[in-house]
Amino acid sequence: MTSWTDFEQAEPELARRARGIISATTNCVLATIRADGSPRASGIDPFFRDGDLWIGSMPDSRKGADLARDPRIALHGIPWESRKVKDGAEDPGDGDVKITGRAVKLGDSEASARILSEYFAEIGVDEPEEGGDLYTIDLATVVVISVADDQLVVDRWSAVDGRKVVKRS
């Protein structure tokens, strides 16, 4: 499994940029795979805690059912122009982030409750009465896409192949 901490150790600058985009936005899109094989896109607010990137699902949600059946995910941090920056978050600059991997359900209910409680307190939201499921991401790829000098810059890291930067005019 490749955790966010593993990624940060391998590529600290790219990890900082990707984390900045995700942490600043209130709006990301998570793609999961439905039972019929078609994609499902869900709005989500991923967060970082204990060296990992986390996502959650509400009790009995379709997203949770998708992840139980097939844990493959894609996460897209919305481009800067179309998103709202969280209060107090640092401006991450231009670009968006795309992450692929597998959602790994946290089976420890006490750890899950602690992580969610800390997160809800941090964002100033009351904890829901019913719990849901909490997942960390086993990273496959992290891509930050930006524009520099009139070129599209695709900065891609893979757990298998490492980092590659491609510039397109």
Language-model features: where?
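Short, conserved active-site entrance elements at the starts or edges of catalytic domains
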Residues: 5-32
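Short beta-strand segments in beta-sandwich/barrel cores
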Residues: 28, 53, 73, 103-104, ...
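Charged, gly/pro-rich active-site loop segments
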Residues: 1-13, 80-82, 87-169
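Charged, amphipathic alpha-helical interaction segments
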Residues: 23, 42, 106-108
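Structural motif corresponding to alpha-helix initiation and N-cap regions
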Residues: 15, 60-61
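Short beta-strand segments
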Residues: 25-59, 65-67, 74-79, 85-90
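Short solvent-exposed loop/turn micro-motifs enriched in small/polar/acidic residues
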Residues: 23-25, 38-39, 60, 96, ...
